Amino acid sequence: MNYLSQLGKLFSLETLDTRLNPTTNPIKRQSIIKKANPTSRWSTLEFKIYLTILIIVVPLMIKAAMESSNETNPNYPRFQHLLSDGWILGRKVDNSDQQYRFFRNNFPLLCGLIFIHVTLRKLINTFIIIPNGRYNNNFKRTYFDLIFGIIFLIGAHGINVFKISFHLFINYLIGKYIKNYKLAIWCTWIYGIFSLFFNEWFGDSSFGLSIFVNGSGYYTGIIPRWDVFYNFTLLRMLSFNLDYIERERKLGNNDGQLNLNKQENINGADNPPTLLNLDDRQRLSAPLPLDDYNVSNYIAYISYTPLFIAGPIITFNDYVYQSNYQQSSTTQNYQRIFMYAIRFLFCLLVMEFLLHFMYVVAVSKTKAWDGDTPFQISMLGMFNLNLIWLKLLIPWRLFRLWALLDGIDPPENMIRCMDNNFSALAFWRAWHRSYNRWVIRYIYIPMGGSGTGKYRIINSLLVFSFVAIWHDIELKLLMWGWLVVIFLIPEISATLIFSKYNKNWWYRYLCGIGAVINIWMMMIANLVGFCLGTDGMWKLLHDLFQTFEGGRFFIISSICLFVGAQIMFELRESELRRAIDVRC
């Protein structure tokens, strides 16, 4: 039984991020617990039936995905050329996804870089760290980040560093030297979005950099496609400007007094509460002195190596606070970091298993689904989405693990399995969570937040339009963003209408029906945007609603989704009983 409890702890929310721990505030704790049904339903006959169905259906889903993508399928010759030699039981591996292939092929190199970076940091910390977890004023952590980051950028992007520097320079000038608050905000956003289009149109241009070319040509670094990772750089650029503009507006002419507070805080004398013991939410708007918004911290933040390639996203205020003022207690708990590393390793091995036994990415690239049943096509799409989830989760967790070892605690990006979602709103809170928090802080709240009625829809439309453009300047992704907003409308409307009936016995079952509709709509939106494209989606919809076998599958799968939704509801009820409410 002890082994089961340890296993449960390993896969709990709390292991991922201390931000997900039960609240310590007794009033909030009781209010969260009161939301839950005090009696667990796991031992009831209803849920025993649900769990039995789950045990039967999940293996059938795996079997269908394997049959539609393995060498026994008649379409195998059409995608065989995309497979590579694997290392599990002599099987081929589907390494055809460009993004994950880059990560997978360079994984040993990344591990070596992590070892070098963390070792250097520990050696330097031996000389500069103060026992109470704060830092020496003579040599701040950000100095090391600045030096290492510049070296890393040159090694990664070579001569293309000049192109990145151009955007950094323009953005810095906008933030620091446009003194009108609204104009600075507008210029920051306009240039930020323009830079995405600029890179799309002119990213491969030399811009006169040929003067640096030697006989062997450009040195473009280990990662020549600098523009692929620029999107994350842009988020940090915007964060610096918007944090600075907001802070400058609040401070007015009182920066001199705050500089004095900063000095007192570092030296430990009469520590002011403004810069001590801030939690993760308070760090987002940490009352930093204006002189912390300098070019050195700007470049150090932009080029912070553990999070540079793909995040998770951490705001400028949070980064500087953790770097130069107070280290997060999470980064000093090595047992927790070890458990996080074990969980990362588990996810990595699951990904390797799926890539060796389900070639769904190769199938989707070649559209090799002729003759497949609606069940098989839907499983191709579903496991494709699972692989997309894993290909994002694994790098994010590796980079977050790297940051934790380095003493910085960024938010966890993925706190739910992709299949453990029934709400479109909650899905976006759990998927790419740090980006979601960034969007809420810098776009959603400034635009008016949730509000009511049409304004909530308009804000959501603006948010998902930016999200789509930020991912890639491609029409199908913009359509995906608008589809998501359209699919949000029924959920928002139903929540407003039926939430007052939440004490009725039938409310849970009504929510289950709504969850089934939500899951279908989310799958359609994401399959169009990221997996099957419009061709594959239209074929699936045609087979579902214009063939007998498809109609039968639609009914059975909807029943299974209802069962899954009820299990998801009870999982969240179990969390509420432990005073955990992550709202997703």
Curated annotation (Swiss-Prot):
Protein name: Membrane-bound O-acyltransferase GUP1
General function of this protein: Membrane-bound O-acyltransferase involved in the remodeling of glycosylphosphatidylinositol (GPI) anchors. Acts only on GPI-anchored proteins, but not on free GPI lipids. Also involved in lipid metabolism, having profound effects on sphingolipid-sterol-ordered domains integrity and assembly. Involved in cell integrity and apoptosis. Plays a role in virulence and antifungal resistance.
Active site feature: H471
GO-annotated cellular components: endoplasmic reticulum; endoplasmic reticulum membrane; mitochondrial membrane; plasma membrane
Keyword set, alphabetical order: Acyltransferase, Cell membrane, Endoplasmic reticulum, Membrane, Mitochondrion, Transferase, Transmembrane, Transmembrane helix
Chief localization: membrane
Gene that specifies this protein: GUP1
Ranges in the topological domain labelled Cytoplasmic: 63-109, 167-182, 317-343, 395-456, 499-509, 572-584
Recorded family membership: Belongs to the membrane-bound acyltransferase family.
Parts of the chain that traverse the membrane: 42-62, 110-130, 146-166, 183-203, 296-316, 344-364, 374-394, 457-477, 478-498, 510-530, 551-571
Mutant phenotype after disruption: Changes ergosterol plasma membrane constitution and distribution and presents an increased resistance to azoles. Impairs the development of hyphae, adhesion, to invasion, and formation of biofilms, all of which are significant virulence factors.
Localization (cell): Cell membrane; Endoplasmic reticulum membrane; Mitochondrion membrane
Positions on the Extracellular side per record topology: 1-41, 131-145, 204-295, 365-373, 531-550
Pfam short name (any one): MBOAT
Keyword hit for Transmembrane: yes
GO MF, any single term: O-acyltransferase activity
